[in-house]
Amino acid sequence: MSFKALVNRAVAGRRFRYYLSRLSAYPAFDPLFDIVANRLGPGLRHICELGFVPDLVIDVGAHAGHWTIAARRHFPKARFLMIEAQLEKEPSLRKVAQTAPGRIEYALALLGPEPRETVEFYLCDTGSSLYQEQTSFSRQATKMAMTTLDAVAGKAMAESGPILLKLDVQGAELDVLAGGTAVLDRAEVVILEASIVAYNAGAPRVAAVIAQLASLGFNLFDVIDLRRIQPVLAQLDLVFVRAGGRLEASAAAIIRHYGSD
């Protein structure tokens, strides 16, 4: 029996689940469970297993490009467009793009619902946003020009098939989507971060995000990360799929056959 088969057998066993549930009662194991809750890799793999292969992946809030690197392992034939507002991340994004010339591109732009000459933007490394964080991390307010997702992604999606759109913009996800109607028309999957608590001042929280995505024609499909700050569940990474699309059809087929084996 292979190592993978042994692991699968152990994990599926009742005894393993029993002892895992016992460990969850001990606070010392909380960091371990928080790590296990980060399921980006399995989440993307499940999308592939259900038959969805994007032609174009748009990574909004790319930061240094780490998400694109991780996602490309699951979608090696897709083209990637990384979009980041922080100008100082350009060397990192360029380095990632150079790993796959012609397959990975990047753009430096602050996205929002409409073009504006200047808006206030809060620089805070991974927490940079249109909405000021409620944390104690140091930040710097600056003025930047704003454009839209459709304007930046127009060339990349001109000849593309289905799109996977990822957004991690610290509370400004709905603002970006408001300026990305053409992208959404072609998207089958939207992955975004949403806050359970008031993490960014004035930013919509998870219930409002789910409701807005539903109004745009996307249903919640998976939860691939839970971010805790001590005992507080602060943020979730959510996967939405097009209502009535191929992924919902694949999921429905699995549910229909559940119990028939």
What is each of the regions a protein language model found here?
Residues 1-261:
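Phosphate/nucleotide-binding beta-alpha loop and adjacent structural elements of enzyme active sites
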